Amino acid sequence: MEVTDVRLRRVNTEGRMKAIASITLDNEFVVHDIRVIDGNNGLFVAMPSKRTPDGEFRDIAHPINSATRGKIQEAILAEYHRLGKLEEELEEAGAS
């Protein structure tokens, strides 16, 4: 399984959520609403979830092993950092 596309929308809020992503797997399956979170130990991805009646959150879709989770997280965070650098370059170009 390969992550064949990552779409990312950065969010400018005061909270810990920094972006929302959608990924395409093997050009065949899309997962929306994956969140990029600024945690205590750095950035990580949180899979789409829904609140249960008792107030807990339950993942709607998630990888079943750590290797797959690593692939997904690596692809999303690479795109997050790429967009961050692009935004910096655009700001610098506009300032000069």
From Swiss-Prot:
GO terms for biological process: division septum assembly; sporulation resulting in formation of a cellular spore. Keywords: Cell cycle, Cell division, Septation. Coiled coil: none annotated. Could be involved in septation. Belongs to the SpoVG family. This is Putative septation protein SpoVG. It comes from Geobacillus kaustophilus (strain HTA426). The gene is spoVG.
